[in-house]
Amino acid sequence: MADEQNLDTQNPEAQAAENAAPSDDLAARVQALEEQLAAAQDQSLRMAAELQNVRRRAEQDVEKAHKFALEKFANDLLPVVDSLERGLELSSPDDEAIKGVREGMQLTLKLFIDTLARHQLEAVEPHGEPFNPEHHQAMAMEESTHVEPNSVLKVFQKGYLLNGRLLRPAMVVVSKAPTTPPPSIDEQA
């Protein structure tokens, strides 16, 4: 045993290497654990951000579903409004025989339009306005000297917006500049 102690004291380099080996192992292990911790923290932050994004998207989807739940139903009701309006346009206000029916149609139409407005459904009536391809569908072009080119001359069918989003475009006739005939030979001479 004395020989072993003697050898240990005679070879301090071996003893230092022996002591250094566990400390190098510990340092490497600490570094590996720190890297794992950093990776876990990064993954945790990413998961928290993803969870927040999923919640936000779900809230937006629910909000849109509430906002536009009536879209299909409202689209199905628009022909009824159109028919009531056409019926009133075609009936004579001076005809005493249908005066009561006409008043009933007017009241029904007003009630219908008020109900649609309560549910954020608004009409697009572009008569005289500049043509807007986002809200209007051009059915025809007509020359006109009375209004500027590319203005709405007539409205065949009103358009509608639901909560600011286009439900149905307005069917319109759009003005265009009159074509000037080429000068004749007599005018050139």
Curated annotation (Swiss-Prot):
InterPro entries, per the entry: GrpE, GrpE_coiled_coil, GrpE_head
Record bears the keyword Manganese: no
GO process annotations (BP): protein folding
Annotated keywords: Chaperone, Cytoplasm, Stress response
An example Gene Ontology molecular-function term: adenyl-nucleotide exchange factor activity
Biased composition (Low complexity): 10-24
Cited CDD domains: GrpE
GO cellular component: cytosol
Domain of life: Bacteria
Keyword Cytoplasm among record annotations: yes
Region of interest called Disordered, as start-end residue ranges on this chain: 1-24
Localisation per UniProt entry: Cytoplasm
Protein role: Participates actively in the response to hyperosmotic and heat shock by preventing the aggregation of stress-denatured proteins, in association with DnaK and GrpE. It is the nucleotide exchange factor for DnaK and may function as a thermosensor. Unfolded proteins bind initially to DnaJ; upon interaction with the DnaJ-bound protein, DnaK hydrolyzes its bound ATP, resulting in the formation of a stable complex. GrpE releases ADP from DnaK; ATP binding to DnaK triggers the release of the substrate protein, thus completing the reaction cycle.
Family: Belongs to the GrpE family.
Quaternary data: Homodimer.
PANTHER family: GRPE PROTEIN, GRPE PROTEIN HOMOLOG, MITOCHONDRIAL
Record-given protein name: Protein GrpE
Source organism (scientific name): Ectopseudomonas mendocina (strain ymp) (Pseudomonas mendocina)
